């Protein structure tokens, strides 16, 4: 891994006020952690930092930080940006020793076209990064996962991956990294039979929505039997 040189200056003032004044000067506050020393508070040019990590390693880029004549190896670990302007406001660095391994997150990249995708499956990446332990100058750019033989319903776990030379995976061995999911079938609703205009409702069925109820006192149709308990009209009144 190539090293990029980054210059910074020590800062003695801390807090929101001094940090604001630094940004007005075109610099940002930063902190260097790690090692056996107390954290070092520095100020640096954000544009220079962003340019320094324009490498395939991104955040895992090994940097040589020069602070007032002293030099130390660091990794860019964290940052804060303005939510509106997206400008870099603060940075954190991890000081490392070239002969001591470090743990970092390395991105996962799939290689090839899964056999299950050709069968209609959907390739899903469950772990977008894996924790790797390696010397600072041996940190890999990415973890490549060959998915060519992966069929529908199958998955690859961390235990099935080969770690890059000089690296160890520090991750759950049974963790699923990538899998091919079975596509979901769309449920088709059963067709609803349309009502036939003028058809009489089934016996005991309620009238259709919007149908008018018979008018009160309306006479039944000719020949119709009177309602139960009702009085017949137009017939004999019975023998005396």
From Swiss-Prot:
GO terms for cellular component: cytosolic large ribosomal subunit. Part of the 50S ribosomal subunit; part of the 5S rRNA/L5/L18/L25 subcomplex. Contacts the 5S rRNA. Binds to the 5S rRNA independently of L5 and L18. This is one of the proteins that binds to the 5S RNA in the ribosome where it forms part of the central protuberance. Residues 220-229 have a biased composition (Low complexity). Gene3D superfamilies: Ribosomal protein L25, beta domain (2.170.120.20), Ribosomal Protein L25, Chain P (2.40.240.10). The keyword Isomerase does not apply. One of its GO terms (biological process) is translation. GO terms for molecular function: 5S rRNA binding; structural constituent of ribosome. Transmembrane segments: none annotated. This is Large ribosomal subunit protein bL25. InterPro entries: Rbsml_bL25/Gln-tRNA_synth_N, Ribosomal_bL25/Gln-tRNA_synth, Ribosomal_bL25_b-dom, Ribosomal_bL25_C, Ribosomal_bL25_long, Ribosomal_L25_dom, Ribosomal_uL5_bac-type. PANTHER family: RIBOSOMAL PROTEIN L25/GLN-TRNA SYNTHETASE, ANTI-CODON-BINDING DOMAIN-CONTAINING PROTEIN, RIBOSOMAL PROTEIN L25_GLN-TRNA SYNTHETASE, ANTI-CODON-BINDING DOMAIN-CONTAINING PROTEIN. NCBIfam families: bL25_bact_ctc (TIGR00731), PRK05618.1-2 (NF004128), PRK05618.3-3 (NF004137). Belongs to the bacterial ribosomal protein bL25 family. CTC subfamily. Residues 230-240 have a biased composition (Basic and acidic residues). Pfam families: Ribosomal_L25p, Ribosomal_TL5_C. Residues 1-20, 220-240 are annotated as: Disordered. Keywords: Ribonucleoprotein, Ribosomal protein, RNA-binding, rRNA-binding.
